[in-house]
Design a protein with these regions (language model features):
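Active-site beta-loop-alpha junctions enriched in small/polar residues
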Residues: 136-140, 184-188, 235-239, 281-286, ...
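N-terminal basic, low-complexity leaders that serve as flexible interaction/assembly modules and, when applicable
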Residues: 1-78
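Active-site-proximal, glycine-rich beta->alpha crossover segments in alpha/beta enzymes
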Residues: 79-175, 181-213
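Catalytic-face loop-and-helix region of soluble metabolic enzyme cores
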Residues: 266-338
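Well-ordered, non-membrane alpha-helical segments in soluble/globular domains
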Residues: 20-27, 103-119, 152-166, 203-220, ...
Length: 338
């Protein structure tokens, strides 16, 4: 049985920039709303991290002397319009290898953990609740931003090396019994779904997207000892979601069923090289009452990892979530919701 018995999970981002919340605001509100039902809480990925991988583009790639900006989105506060509006970089002529001193996730995690610990000591956050740190997996943080296959491979190695150091720093700085690390897996999903632009000839990297995804997980999990929880968030995106539209509007691709998510969960857990405590998979609102959508859960094989299903949608709230839970429960007996 997994150590994680949470009934509810916040995947990462919580507050919109216009809410004006800081880390403490996020944690106080989250603890008040779902604290007794959640086994871990994030810091809300506020500020630049709200725009997910664009945080890496703005803070790391755009400032690197060997990377040249070809284009970037034009919306204020660096918010992209959609999946075709990312920054785009190239690597300078003659450069064969690049390196990053840091990406920034370790520094953000350590600052947020200090607030988490204070709030827990004050009784705002319950004892035993863990602090969750969400980090983009390698392909998600690199492929949308780079101009050629050769440069993608160079950037893949550079980000991977840097993020391995950062997760080690996080594990060295935060008590293991207080920590949960989640890999955010999105572009890897797009590659497996066969989306245009995500299949190409590769020389250094494994060309099969599932093998490449598993190779990445094995590599970045090596610095994470047993003790901290480890989780996989298998994501179809929310970047293009607009207020007033359904939650499906944010997905880069319609999720017709959970086959790809189950495949990635099963293979990912085996690849990590250590125990995995939780898995989170997205649920398409438009297909959420279709029993066939959930049937792949029958072959979910993730050992003791606790599974969270993205069954909560703004369109129909609690009533809709309960109906989707009942359908999903026919194919998976034990799960939390997100």
């Amino acid at each position: 049985m997994s150590d994680d018995h949470g009934h509810m999970m916040l995947v990462g981002s919580v507050a919109r920039p216009e809410d004006g919340w800081n880390v403490e605001d996020v944690m106080r509100n989250a603890a008040n709303a779902i604290g007794e039902h959640a086994s871990m809480l994030p810091d809300g990925e506020i500020g630049d991290r709200y725009y997910w991988i664009n945080y890496v583009a703005r803070r790391t790639y755009a400032e690197h002397p060997d990377m040249k900006t070809l284009s970037h989105h034009t919306i204020d506060d660096w918010k992209p319009k959609g999946y075709d509006d990312h920054w785009l970089f190239t690597i300078a002529d003659g450069v064969k290898e690049i390196a990053f001193d840091k990406i920034g996730y370790a520094g953000e995690a350590k600052k947020s953990y200090a607030i988490f610990k204070r709030l827990r000591d004050e009784g705002v956050i319950g004892q035993g609740v863990r602090f969750m740190v969400a980090i983009p997996l390698i392909e998600s943080a690199t492929r949308p931003f780079i101009d050629t296959t050769e440069h993608f491979e160079m950037l893949w190695r550079a980000y991977g090396n840097a993020i391995r150091r950062e997760v080690k720093d996080i594990c060295d700085s935060i008590p293991h019994e207080d920590l949960a690390i989640q890999w955010d897996i999105c572009v890897e999903v797009a590659a497996l779904e066969g989306l245009e632009g995500f299949t190409s000839d590769l020389s250094y990297l494994e060309s099969d997207p599932m093998k490449r995804y598993c190779d990445a997980l094995k590599w970045v999990c090596e610095p994470i000892p047993e003790g901290p929880w480890l989780g996989l968030h298998i994501c179809y995106g929310s970047l293009s979601h607009e207020e007033g539209q359904g939650s499906d509007s944010g997905h880069f691709h319609e999720i017709t069923d959970l086959n790809v998510s189950v495949d990635m969960a099963n293979e990912g857990v085996k690849a990590c090289g250590r125990s995995v405590q939780f898995i989170q998979v997205s649920v398409q609102f438009s297909n959420g009452f279709d029993e066939a959508y959930y049937k792949p859960l029958e072959r979910l094989d993730v050992g003791d990892a606790h599974t969270y299903l993205g069954l909560i949608h703004l369109q129909d709230g609690v009533d809709g979530a309960l109906k989707r839970m009942a359908i999903a429960g026919k194919y998976l007996s034990d799960f939390g919701i997100s």
